[in-house]
Amino acid sequence: MKRSAFLACAVATLALAACNKKEQQGSAPAVNDTVKITQANPPPGGNWSDVVNETAAGYLMGNPSAKVKLVEIGALTCPHCREFDEKGVPVLIEKYVKSGQVSWEFRPYLLHGLDLPANLIARCNGTKSFFPLARALYKDQADWIAKISAVPEAQLEQVQNLPINQQFVELAKLAGLQDWAAARGVSLEKSNQCLRDENEVNQLVQLSSDVSTQYPDFPGTPSFIINGAMLKETASWEKLQPQLDEALK
């Protein structure tokens, strides 16, 4: 099996069940945007970027009642998403999120077989750790993708023959993600548990599948939504920032 085919397989195998389910039920329901609020008051010093809540579809940083609600649909293996994280996110947080005027929600999308183990690790240490881990994964993206790219085809084929919940542990090991996570406070024992969590895996696959159902014009990653409206031709901070400014008027 070619490398690209295998690395898509981890997503495709699980997505098949979600697709079949949607065919039986008709269209999938829209994502519930309810935020599971654990803190809705300004933190000490008024820095809203310290407030993170889990949502039905991802994680939200900032004021849940912000005037402008920004949603990013991103993939942790996506180089353009990494570029947005590098160039746009620092300004987004400092200028817009901290004040409480804008909230930023990250919703995962699965482009590549490695997106599943990467997301499972980013979610592994709880709500407060999600953004630091996800941003660190973007920073080191080239390294862990290079490691999996160097794995011989025969070894990848052996991984493919493992049960699904073991495949993600092995993919994470081959990409160096478990050692990477351990250096950032996610123990080997904990990452093993998270990587074998079939409920989390199924949830990530379903959330990714639901994106194209809820947003038929979804153009790929990264994509951005402001107050419920998908933005067109907006895949960079340079394109996004003027639209944030306009929404704040």
What would you call each of these model-derived segments?
Residues 110-220, 225-229, 233-238, 242-249:
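Cysteine-centric redox/oxidoreductase cores and disulfide-bonded domains
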Residues 2-9, 14-116, 205-208, 212-213:
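Extracytoplasmic thiol/disulfide redox context detector
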